[in-house]
Amino acid sequence: MQYKDENGVNEPSRRRLLKGIGALALAGSCPVAHAQKTQSAPGTLSPDARNEKQPFYGEHQAGILTPQQAAMMLVAFDVLASDKADLERLFRLLTQRFAFLTQGGAAPETPNPRLPPLDSGILGGYIAPDNLTITLSVGHSLFDERFGLAPQMPKKLQKMTRFPNDSLDAALCHGDVLLQICANTQDTVIHALRDIIKHTPDLLSVRWKREGFISDHVSRSKGKETPINLLGFKDGTANPDSQNDKLMQKVVWVTADQQEPAWTIGGSYQAVRLIQFRVEFWDRTPLKEQQTIFGRDKQTGAPLGMQHEHDVPDYASDPEGKVIALDSHIRLANPRTAESESSLMLRRGYSYSLGVTNSGQLDMGLLFVCYQHDLEKGFLTVQKRLNGEALEEYVKPIGGGYFFSLPGVKDANDYLGSALLRV
């Protein structure tokens, strides 16, 4: 006797019987299966994670010091606003949408079915906050002649120029504004983007977009675990403590003593780099060489010659680089000197995977994002130290830009960029 399987293919009854026996045997070999039913399986969210939310109003925007969520998107836009009043309308509208999307609520009902639906519907009838943050930053080009904002441009904001190892694609660089959208799940990120685009058809045009991720279990650790990049190394071990308010005032936020325009206080310089990895080449590189290039043990993340990930390397006792090479990534990025302390920055990077290149290689890498109170002392100084590092053979920056993340929204009567546009 024969039966048809789920694909409509005839299957002998004996084979079906063996499948059933195998399934029972497998179930019998897992005595803890019932005990695990109440727990979240790896890669899934706990039942209440969709209701997790970040405060929207405050001195600073969320999404900068916020522990990294699992899903992320960078979207750069060209602004279509015709004048300063139109730009204010855009920023007010973005503030309204961000406030709703990040706090959650019922999806709007469409009163007339002959009209387009008011919501994409991809989250269902209730839009859960899902730990969503949307961080708005402005680029150098927003301060051109269109809106009369040139005198108010942040002092260190500039157009990203090419470093020696860069292979920049103009279609993936710069932007009048940049949104960093992060949430526990990717569908929430996509829903937020579509909502924003739907509400701003005459004000914004997408320039470029990239989506990123970190491991779900790393995200759920709320900063206690370090993300691992697609080269297999921990990424962000030496980050300053984002929960230390005094340190963040020194490292991340623009303050009143910096001689910046007054409206920038509470904001932060944002550097974004889209970095493609040559993963096939890297995977054929000996482990010892990989570790020498980074200066860390690949499995533990510890500096070479040390035991634990967060051990502080002692470069003074290794002046010739016999343990940690002089051109290793960690030694160049942070030499641990009194002078280099001023170049600290808060990294918030994500991995990306985007199909294959035209040459048939895997297109994957890092969406590097960092925040600092001074772009020149922070990212630009660090990147100049990294020029010529051994890692350059395996990585290729292809896009990004420099932006300024606006200060936060005080309350429901305020809006993003209000201090800038009221000058």
Swiss-Prot record:
Modification after translation: Predicted to be exported by the Tat system. The position of the signal peptide cleavage has not been experimentally proven.
Catalytic reaction annotation: heme b + 2 H(+) = protoporphyrin IX + Fe(2+)
UniProt keyword list: Heme, Iron, Lyase, Metal-binding, Oxidoreductase, Periplasm, Peroxidase, Signal
Cofactor: heme b
Keyword Oxidoreductase among UniProt keywords: yes
GO biological process, one term: iron import into cell
This protein's GO CC annotations: cytosol; periplasmic space
Enzyme Commission number(s): 4.98.1.1, 1.11.1.-
Keyword Iron: yes
Bound cofactor: record note: Binds 1 heme b (iron(II)-protoporphyrin IX) group non-covalently per subunit.
Signal peptide: 1-35
Cellular localisation: Periplasm
Binding site for heme b: G236, T237, A238, H329, N334, P335, R336, R347
Pfam families: Dyp_perox_C, Dyp_perox_N
Domain of life: Bacteria
GO molecular function, one term: heme binding
Assembly mode: Homodimer. Part of a ferrous iron transporter composed of EfeU, EfeO and EfeB.
Family: Belongs to the DyP-type peroxidase family. EfeB subfamily.
Function text: Involved in the recovery of exogenous heme iron. Extracts iron from heme while preserving the protoporphyrin ring intact.
UniProt name for this protein: Deferrochelatase
Organism encoding this protein: Shigella sonnei (strain Ss046)
